[in-house]
């Protein structure tokens, strides 16, 4: 039987549910802090899973994309993220083709496949949204993401260095190499 405090916290969480996942998770984070819990930074717990630039393969693709384009794509993804609409965009020819919605990155990749643009050099850009609670809500990629990217015709991925998680990094980078995909951590 829930007490009045529990009901209060459930209502607080429900009120933030429709404001975006960052608002919801930040509210839950605040509740834990108020209750005296120490919330650990996921980046300290999963150091080997944090995106870095050691696997960047730009040199292999420098005839397809410039460093200036990479920076531009990163910045437009950050602008999009400031709207709390999603962590990911798909870009090509200096334009956003598709934006992530509440259905997530996998759905975004699926929607790209429907465009049938496999001949272009489209990239998935997955970043940490401005003002996102980085203690536990980091953008994440992994083997499934890489397989989906490859199957959809997307040619690679740009992630945010030090603010993105890579699930099963060894397998993820094996697949990036196997599928000849572009990878760059900004």
Label the model's feature ranges.
Residues 147-186:
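C-terminal binding/interaction regions
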Residues 1-9, 17-28, 32-150, 163:
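Conserved mixed alpha/beta catalytic, RNA-binding, or beta-rich assembly cores of soluble enzyme
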